[in-house]
Amino acid sequence: MNQFFFENIQKSAFLSKKTHFLHYLSQILWIFQYFFVLLSSQMSAPAINIKGKLFSLAQPRVMAIINATNDSFAFSCSNISEAEILAVAAKAVNEGADMLDIGACSTRPGSTPVDEAEEWRRLQIALRAVRSAYPDAILSVDTFRASIARRAVTDFGVDIINDISGGIGEMFTSVAQLGVPYILTHNAPMNDSLPVSVQVIDYLIRKVDELHRLGVKDVIIDPGFGFNKSVEQSLELLDNLSDLHVIGLPILVGLSRKSMFYKPLGVEPTSEEALQATVEANRKAIALGASIIRVHDVAINKPLTTKR
């Protein structure tokens, strides 16, 4: 391990002065444990278990975003219908999406989440349509509510839970009981005096520890670009994305048309400039070892995954 790695471990020990020394000792031991897991995992290709079958991540994969909401720049309608959802899903599948991530409650910064009943109403429409049309598709549900996750897996056989909250409420125990892969997102306040990647690694390792103790076997980590992070912090995180390999788990990046690109450019998220910035960011993320890119625009991003 290089000098930067050791320096960052030392810095991370000051994240909370009130935390007992033994906590940091445990943290360091976990970092070393994950480092050795990483070394051993290099002997075989990374994969996740989807309903008893290994889904390889040896080559990067494309996760298509399907927003069953009425306030998304990528997909907006006043009355969400199966036909509208299917049109988006069909386009993504035809363009080469490896998995479909369906969300029915906007989680973009500044948005007001709909209540649980409305989220489930929208999600049922989307899942019924997509599962019927594409029974073999790998489906992910984007939700921070454990109850929604349980119903999605039980009623529609959803394959993956994508949770931007970092595991609030009963999410961790629910995912453990459901036995499905879980996407863990960094979503916590940042300390301006510490390197971004150090804070993200510290947070994710603690959460992964908790998930593993509960019996969750397949975890994908998402550094959470834009969540509780400034534009500068998100860009720093992208530059240092390879640091996250110390955790030894597949990395998903959600960079698609994020404000970290369109705000500095002074353009709208729907603009061509925002799209091109997304493509270049995804290209960089893959070069730094990302296993999954989560995107609105499949066709233009798919070619990035043919070569690492």
Q: What are the roles of these predicted feature ranges?
A:
Residues 50, 72-88, 107-125, 144-149, ...:
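Active-site-adjacent loop and "lid" segments of alpha/beta metabolic enzymes
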Residues 66, 92, 96, 161, ...:
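Conserved, mostly hydrophobic/aromatic
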